[in-house]
A protein has these predicted regions:
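Short, well-ordered surface patches within globular domains
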Residues: 74, 78-84
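GGW-centered surface loops in extracellular recognition modules
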Residues: 1-10
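Structured loops at beta-to-helix junctions and adjacent beta-edge loops in soluble globular domains
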Residues: 38, 81, 133-135
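Extracellular/periplasmic catalytic domains that process cell-envelope and extracellular macromolecules
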Residues: 1, 71, 123
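Glycine-rich (often Gly-Gly/Gly-Pro-rich) flexible segments and glycine-rich loop motifs
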Residues: 91-173
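Glycine-rich strand-loop-strand elements at beta-sheet edges
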Residues: 9-70, 84-90, 99, 164-165, ...
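Ser/Thr- (and often Asn-) enriched beta-sheet segments in non-cytosolic proteins
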Residues: 47-51, 77, 145
Length: 174
């Protein structure tokens, strides 16, 4: 028996679609959830099934990545990222890391960033997993806001967006 360190990462999501006619931007796609499982005891000749989650196309969530199979104690699921908000939907979607909220088409509207679901997984997938929420678009009174929230990452929450400013006020990725 040997000890191995295992890194499992879900597929990243696609960003949301903006509206050229309304000069709004889609939210950033969330990163896939990340799991670092150090010191797993495994036999050298032990076969392990691994499924790699693909990245999402525009407005599509990333796929889940799995390591092992249930009911093994080292069965791990890294959730795919949540897709970025688009128009007219607005809100970013939940995932391993959440997608960012889209820029608004109307005055004072808000769009939430998607929540992270990685920590809600059972067993080591949640206990050892990391993911953060997407950033939101917080309104601000401009009919054409341009900006959008950044997708969440493995290191931080996605940046909040606000109208105006550099880069049209878009939030940074987490």
């Amino acid at each position: 028996t040997s000890e191995v360190d295992v890194l499992v990462v879900g597929g990243g999501a696609g960003g949301g679609v903006g509206s050229a006619g309304n000069n709004t931007h889609g939210g950033g796609g969330g990163a896939g959830g990340l799991i670092l499982a150090p010191g797993l005891a495994m036999d050298a000749d032990e076969a392990v099934t691994v499924t790699i989650g693909g990245g999402g196309a525009s407005t599509t969530a990333g796929g889940d990545t799995t390591f092992g199979a249930a009911p093994s104690p080292w069965y791990l699921i890294a959730k795919g990222g949540g897709d970025g908000g688009d128009q007219p939907r607005g809100d970013g979607q939940a995932g391993g890391s959440g997608g960012g909220g889209a820029g608004s088409q109307s005055a004072n509207a808000e769009a939430s960033g998607g929540a992270t679901t990685q920590g809600q997984q059972s067993g080591n997938s949640g206990n050892l997993g990391v993911g953060y929420a997407g950033g939101a678009f917080g309104g601000g009174g401009n009919t054409v806001a341009h900006s959008a929230g950044g997708g969440g990452g493995a290191g931080a929450v996605g940046g909040q967006a606000s109208p105006g400013g550099g880069n049209y006020g878009a939030g940074n990725g987490g």
